[in-house]
Amino acid sequence: MEWSEIFHDITERHDFKEMHDFLEKEYTTQTIYPDRDNIYQAFDLTPFEDVKVVILGQDPYHGPNQAHGLAFSVQPSAKFPPSLRNMYQELEDDIGCHRTSPHLQDWAREGVLLLNTVLTVRQGQAHSHKDIGWETFTDEVIQAISKYRDDVVFILWGKPAQQKIKLIDTSKHYIIKSPHPSPLSAYRGFFGSKPYSKTNDYLVSKGKSPINWCENGED
């Protein structure tokens, strides 16, 4: 199965077409992130049949030269966002990987779907595209992964992400929950949660190859 098969029915619906028309106006009259060409980059880099892990974010970074379609990731030239810095600190504490690039394209190519629940945002206005229709789209993506794939790890950081558990068949997938890596909550249980080693232990137990979380020089 391919993403195009999953997207076909969604994109034909009236509500999606309304959202598309709204976004056309937004991109014409506002500064919107990511660039149009990168809205669906998470799906371009991680084909449906390759998805081993889903890391769920909220909406894209809303500063210049940051968002490029992958949750938590920023463009190589950008400064490290605080949440990503904490993710990397936990990565080093968990499995000893020291990453220097804020770009997560290599994770995406390993089978980690870095999915925001909202895929666009106005510059400088967090959550400005909340409730325009993206949540319906990404909920259906999560449900399709749950239904058609087996033994996927869903990493859900923070309460908004954890609300999506209801979309996932927990009898056939593995859920990792903790507080969000944001500086506001990282010390309440994100640090020490070992999501990276837990993910790989599960994948190996199911006969799948582990994720190479360490930097591979691709960026």
Curated annotation (Swiss-Prot):
It catalyses: Hydrolyzes single-stranded DNA or mismatched double-stranded DNA and polynucleotides, releasing free uracil. Excises uracil residues from the DNA which can arise as a result of misincorporation of dUMP residues by DNA polymerase or due to deamination of cytosine. The gene is ung. Its EC number is 3.2.2.27. The lineage of its organism: Bacteria, Bacillati, Bacillota, Bacilli, Bacillales. GO terms for cellular component: cytoplasm. This is Uracil-DNA glycosylase. It comes from Staphylococcus haemolyticus (strain JCSC1435). Belongs to the uracil-DNA glycosylase (UDG) superfamily. UNG family. InterPro entries: UDG_fam1, Ura-DNA_Glyclase_AS, Uracil-DNA_glycosylase-like, Uracil-DNA_glycosylase-like_sf. One of its GO terms (molecular function) is uracil DNA N-glycosylase activity. Keywords: Cytoplasm, DNA damage, DNA repair, Hydrolase.
